[in-house]
């Protein structure tokens, strides 16, 4: 399949378009960005493509859980106009979401493929990614893998169950958030005992087990902790998943509490519809 569609032209959808249009025919639809859309509706997009990437917000509700309403309504719309399409969800969703959508909608095969982009360098991150993970039912995952292979000849592509693929995204984002909170606490300790934190990091990184990223404090934005549209909502979503399944998320909650301490401005709360639901 050489034609793909993309719903949503935020940084994820834009990265897919820019990174794949040299090898595939790409059509787009974004109800809020008509100037970036080649189609006027999901219905039109379905007529022109068979594989559709869903790149839409999954913001945090007031209780910390993941708001899936935008993704769910979009998959429902694809299903309505589908002639056995494949919907590839790039939005971060809790484990079990893809399975549930496949049970609910019969005209579309839903696959999950997490993105690992940074908002600051999303175009380069997409073009230079070192792994692609695809979770969901066969033959849809095989079709999606073959589609990706036309663009990324050398990249490792892994097919797995959708629950695993969904959890990998939370594992990655929440581990990196943990590093940020740890770094901020270490910086506080170093300041109190009159030790140069940057030197501690420099010498500590001689141990190759410690990754170099997410240890600078303040961070790239000049502030403590983590903010933006991803880490806060994803950490809280995983905390909510843990509690719902009888797991006490001691570490994750400590990460969040430290972040609230070192980033009191809570900039994510201003990102209505992206980091937090509009109801918040």
Outline where the language-model segments fall.
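Structural/interface elements that position substrates and couple domains in central-metabolism enzymes
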Residues: 1-280
């Amino acid at each position: 399949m050489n034609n793909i569609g993309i719903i949503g032209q935020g940084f994820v959808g834009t990265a897919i378009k820019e990174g794949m249009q040299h090898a595939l025919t790409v059509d787009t639809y974004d109800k809020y960005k008509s100037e970036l859309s080649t189609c006027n509706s999901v219905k039109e997009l379905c007529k022109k493509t068979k594989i559709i990437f869903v790149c839409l917000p999954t913001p945090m509700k007031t209780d910390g859980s993941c708001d899936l309403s935008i993704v769910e309504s979009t998959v429902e719309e694809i299903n309505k106009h589908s002639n056995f399409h494949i919907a590839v969800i790039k939005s971060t969703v809790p484990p079990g979401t893809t399975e549930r959508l496949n049970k609910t909608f019969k005209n579309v095969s839903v696959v999950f493929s997490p993105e690992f982009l940074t908002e600051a360098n999303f175009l380069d991150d997409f073009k230079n990614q070192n792994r692609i993970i695809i979770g969901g039912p066969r033959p849809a995952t095989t079709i999606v893998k073959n589609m990706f292979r036309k663009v990324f000849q050398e990249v490792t592509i892994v097919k797995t169950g959708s629950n695993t693929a969904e959890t990998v995204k939370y594992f990655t984002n929440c581990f990196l958030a943990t590093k940020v909170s740890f770094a901020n606490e270490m910086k506080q300790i170093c300041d109190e005992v009159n030790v140069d934190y940057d030197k501690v990091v420099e010498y500590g990184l001689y141990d190759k087990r410690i990754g170099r990223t997410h240890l600078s404090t303040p961070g790239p934005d000049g502030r403590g902790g983590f903010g933006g549209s991803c880490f806060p909502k994803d950490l809280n979503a995983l905390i909510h998943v843990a509690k719902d399944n009888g797991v006490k998320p001691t570490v994750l909650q400590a990460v969040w509490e430290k972040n609230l301490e070192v980033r009191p401005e809570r900039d994510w709360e201003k990102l209505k519809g992206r980091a937090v639901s509009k109801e918040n």
